[in-house]
From Swiss-Prot:
GO terms for cellular component: host cell plasma membrane; membrane; viral envelope; virion membrane. Filoviruses entry requires functional lipid rafts at the host cell surface. This is Envelope glycoprotein. It comes from Lake Victoria marburgvirus (strain Popp-67) (MARV). The record marks 435-436 as: Cleavage.
Amino acid sequence: MKTTCLFISLILIQGIKTLPILEIASNNQPQNVDSVCSGTLQKTEDVHLMGFTLSGQKVADSPLEASKRWAFRTGVPPKNVEYTEGEEAKTCYNISVTDPSGKSLLLDPPTNIRDYPKCKTIHHIQGQNPHAQGIALHLWGAFFLYDRIASTTMYRGRVFTEGNIAAMIVNKTVHKMIFSRQGQGYRHMNLTSTNKYWTSNNGTQTNDTGCFGALQEYNSTKNQTCAPSKIPSPLPTARPEIKPTSTPTDATTLNTTDPNNDDEDLITSGSGSGEQEPYTTSDAVTKQGLSSTMPPTPSPQPSTPQQEGNNTDHSQGTVTEPNKTNTTAQPSMPPHNTTAISTNNTSKNNFSTLSVSLQNTTNYDTQSTATENEQTSAPSKTTLPPTGNLTTAKSTNNTKGPTTTAPNMTNGHLTSPSPTPNPTTQHLVYFRKKRSILWREGDMFPFLDGLINAPIDFDPVPNTKTIFDESSSSGASAEEDQHASPNISLTLSYFPNINENTAYSGENENDCDAELRIWSVQEDDLAAGLSWIPFFGPGIEGLYTAGLIKNQNNLVCRLRRLANQTAKSLELLLRVTTEERTFSLINRHAIDFLLTRWGGTCKVLGPDCCIGIEDLSRNISEQIDQIKKDEQKEGTGWGLGGKWWTSDWGVLTNLGILLLLSIAVLIALSCICRIFTKYIG
């Protein structure tokens, strides 16, 4: 009788506490993906392929609506296949795919882009799968779209278009770390999952997840999160096999979002019992390098989260962050009294970056996970950016949210109260005498729209060349450089050589007399000496000649100033046109890369729309140089111009000839007079 009562009590207690979504059963030996669908393809030893089940269209009617792709080869169209809801959507794809001769069948990633391809957030999908029911983790992994192009969004309750697949490539160690713990469900994890890759700095293993050391068990009454831990618990080597605990839920009853919205960052998925469970994920913008092989033992550090925009989930969730004096996990409020914080940032052309640095000042070795009672009694805190920032945050519901703390403002960045700097804090770098353009790691291309995240300190340098300089953050330490994204600085050649200033060069406003005016008719007569020579003689002409020369010099100075201003204006126009041409070419190369399998931009748009931008910057620079040479050229002589007899030497020659003719006439007259006198006398 006592045993029966105890058994009934256990059943009742177990009924109160919701069962985990997943039951994980480990096998003895891990199993790897040793083969692919077709062809002679090579397998990368560092990856593990995971398949997921998607809910979508059951029959593909056209290539653009195909729900599966079997071969990921360049130029191979997708195969039209029937798709049954609940079917396991496995796709054979590895990072390294070559033909028997060793030639790669995939497109090469674009240059100047690190850690390619990229992912964005954690997303949920519906259905059953031997690995994970209702969850698609691409932490340290990538959903692939087309040929090595990363798909940033998985859709829920939508028809899957051509190329949208449900396969993830992750590190095998990470795979075992995720799926080797029994009795824990990982559907709700407040993970900062943007651009998480491993790096090694002289043997020191680091990452920026900040949330994989102590994963909490998911419960319907408490949306628990995980606290960062430097030394994770030992992981078993067995490969897990996940079994669903209940029947699959109906996809139509779980679809609560707008069906017309394809860019969903927050997606609600149901539990095994068919009820909806809200959750919220927080994306983080981190700057970290990619190691070719991921370390087997992670050591998480606090990350630098950033609230991503375009959050379209209408459910409720929580966003938590660790306190600087308490490194244990901060539990969230119950689902009926929670607040989901979304960033109101619908414009992609946002030139401000919300950077929040989280720093734990206590020792990592003393960190421990709080118990369930301690978590329920601890308050939950959320950090809200101030309203003055360009990127604003607001609550998605009108319920009373948790306690908010205003962060400190430091150099335009939002930071939590922390006395020590964070090595993973995002730095905005100013390149003096360069056009500095910062791009965030994870963006598809550095010069696409909305990717300029830093102010511009532009001071052009004369005689510079057009270069691409890929460097780390200036002023940062070596450890920060390991996590910093490359700064693509574009230095363009704008200004030609400029000689030293001469007298009346017009370079400065004070070079020329401001009292420049046009002479009247009387003043012209005075300058010509027509009115005063008969009275005062030609000696007084020098006074008026000096005034005439001064006025002429002012005219020359004003002309030089006008030439300099014209040259500077042309230089500004050349700067703008050169920059626009550079950006246009970069965007054109990016579009050509995306449309390579269809023949490129000219093939898709047609030859009439395939135009090029002619580079005339050299011609304009030559004209600017010529203007400056002309206005700085010092003229010599009288400069009367005209034919040879009116030139400088021509005038002297003419005077000499006239003088000789005059002497000859005088001699002739003298001779004539003597002859006439002789004959008369």
